[in-house]
């Protein structure tokens, strides 16, 4: 049995269990993501050993499933959870009679034919996305064409989403993606990047590497990369510095990292930054440690002054990511909003359920939109919240997906390198020693020629 959340679990099955005569997978379980339990992993992806596919059941039924399906092994396969959470699940599996297993990189990472740079994080919401965008821009400046491969988010038709390629914004509509997927893909597409994602990452890898000088793995949650990285960059949030040593598999990617970015130093206290340095130094004393900021940009931000505002934040960050707020809340404070209106008492349906499931979420609205009904409930929650204005802290253009009955402003944020060593330095050293050195030199010379 594979204990999952519609991502890592499917990958682990595809690369380690599919076609493996030593195992027969009797079920997946689902957590974190709504509307996954009750479905089936399709035969088209499961292979000939599974003519009826594989059922996906609620994690809450773990003990009953292990005993009823006579599962010998429970394989933990999702991310962004505390070490304690993992061991509670282990105890549940063991008490039901099953072994408990974690699969490591040797069994789950695929080898690419082109260099791979992976961006991962200690926790969801640390700043992977803007780091990925910055790395892609630095590569492009050097004449190196990156193709981004994103950690899976197969929340629709699993078989149809086996291999997805996004090159223009209209591809998002073509693939019927959720708000959560748009949050990741839209900023990359606006920057001119090609993005691959889906379910079957062996097929995705072979497609993506055909059009890339380098593959740029854009991690999800705090998970390990699915491809063997030639350079692993892990982002740490100093607001949750101690989490780097207490969350799975974030601690793993901190320990594995070649470079560690301590992000958000512009909003963290000196004590928080010092704690982050101490923690990552203890876990990985050999990594290059970089400091970076996440400056916030709000077009027309002055309109927030003295207004009562509703803040909509990136959903994963303020739910299983454990942050009470995000960039939208910071922007509302910075631009002197009169009040950040608490939406929790106005929430309806699954949005209300989300607050119950994640009581650590602060007085902000997670941009949950895993299906049409949830998007409607999100819109209704916004309508019911008595505010003058909506502050959109999620990266997606929410106004195009949800009918807003209030004026809105969007918050944007990018990675800003601070001091030495820098991400530019780390990337430059990597390129000098990789097969990309010649292309990098030609690209740098061309850039210098343009600037002169």
Residue ranges, per PLM feature:
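Phosphate-binding P-loop
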Residues: 108-116
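P-loop (Walker A) phosphate-binding loop of NTP-binding proteins
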Residues: 122-123
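Intrinsically disordered, low-complexity terminal tails and inter-domain linkers enriched
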Residues: 436-449
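Phosphate-bearing ligand-interacting subdomains
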Residues: 43-106, 375, 384-398, 402-403
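A solvent-exposed beta-alpha-beta segment
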Residues: 1-71, 339-352
């Amino acid at each position: 049995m594979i204990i999952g959340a519609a991502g890592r679990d499917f990958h682990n099955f595809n690369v380690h269990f599919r076609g493996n005569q030593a195992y027969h997978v009797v079920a997946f379980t689902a957590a974190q993501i709504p509307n996954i339990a009750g479905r089936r992993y399709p035969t088209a992806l499961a292979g000939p050993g599974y003519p009826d596919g594989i059922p996906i059941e609620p994690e809450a039924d773990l003990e009953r499933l292990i005993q009823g399906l006579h599962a010998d092994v429970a394989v933990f396969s999702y991310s962004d959870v505390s070490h304690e959470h993992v061991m509670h699940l282990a105890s549940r599996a063991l008490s039901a009679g099953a072994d408990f297993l974690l699969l490591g990189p040797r069994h789950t990472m695929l080898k690419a034919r082109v260099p791979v740079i992976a961006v991962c994080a200690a926790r969801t919401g640390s700043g992977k996305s803007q780091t990925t965008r910055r790395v892609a821009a630095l590569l492009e400046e050097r004449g190196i064409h990156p193709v981004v491969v994103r950690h899976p988010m197969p929340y629709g038709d699993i078989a149809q989403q086996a291999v997805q390629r996004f090159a223009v914004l209209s591809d998002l509509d073509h693939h019927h993606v959720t708000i959560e997927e748009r949050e990741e893909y839209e900023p990359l597409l606006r920057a001119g990047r090609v993005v691959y994602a889906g379910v079957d990452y062996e097929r995705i890898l072979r497609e993506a590497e055909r059009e890339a000088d380098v593959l740029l793995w854009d991690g999800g949650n705090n998970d390990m990369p699915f491809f063997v990285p030639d350079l692993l960059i892990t982002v740490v949030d100093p607001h949750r510095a101690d989490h780097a040593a207490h969350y799975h598999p974030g601690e793993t990617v901190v320990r594995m990292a070649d470079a560690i970015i301590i992000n958000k130093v512009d909003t963290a206290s000196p004590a928080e930054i010092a704690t982050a340095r101490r923690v990552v130094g203890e876990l990985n004393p050999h990594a290059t440690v970089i400091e970076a900021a996440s400056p916030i940009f709000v077009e027309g931000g002055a309109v927030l002054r003295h207004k009562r505002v509703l803040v909509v934040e990136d959903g994963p960050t303020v739910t299983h990511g454990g942050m009470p707020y995000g960039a939208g809340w910071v922007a509302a404070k910075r631009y002197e909003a009169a009040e950040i209106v608490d939406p929790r008492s106005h929430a309806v349906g699954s949005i209300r359920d989300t607050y119950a499931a994640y009581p650590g979420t602060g007085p902000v609205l997670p941009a949950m939109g895993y299906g049409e009904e949830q998007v409607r409930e999100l819109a209704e929650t916004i309508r019911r919240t008595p505010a003058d204005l909506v502050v959109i802290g999620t990266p997606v253009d929410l106004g195009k997906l949800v009918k807003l009955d209030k004026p809105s402003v969007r918050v944007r944020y990018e990675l800003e390198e601070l001091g030495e060593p820098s991400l530019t330095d780390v990337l430059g050293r990597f390129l000098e020693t990789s097969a990309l050195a010649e292309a990098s030199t030609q690209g740098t010379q061309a850039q210098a020629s343009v600037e002169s």
